[in-house]
Amino acid sequence: SKFFFIASAWNGYIDCNIKSGDAGFVKIVEKGIIEYPEYDGNSMYRTAGNISKNPNVALLFLNFDGKSRRIRINGQATIHHDKKSIEDHFGAKFVVRINCEIYPNCPRYIPNLEKDEPSAYVPRKGKGIPPAPEWKERDYIKNILPKDDPHKNRN
């Protein structure tokens, strides 16, 4: 799957986000351990912030083709900023690694959307800086983007 949903929680609040990338962006490290890159996001770090306080996560992988099985994963996540972890994921700010239990699930009720168009926002080798998402152009956001944000001083 080129995307998955991840639920994380801290302080009584559950947060669900979508994570996406090119095919293979989620890597199997070894039996029972997967990892994925965290790219430039909205600087809220909700998933990463929750993981730093509570490592328990739930992931849902699915293809909207009407036939592929869903994959549910429950596990404990850790955040890795080391060079070795990051170099395996082009464009990553850091890597999230998950010790997991995997539960295959039937494709019943999954719609067939069959539109396979890659996101222009995923960093790709040789493609330069991805376009800025609309929200980074908002006046109240522009000035508070991180210093190293590639879209901070673009017009």
Q: Which residues does each predicted region cover?
A:
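Binding-site signature for planar aromatic cofactors or substrates
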Residues: S1-N155
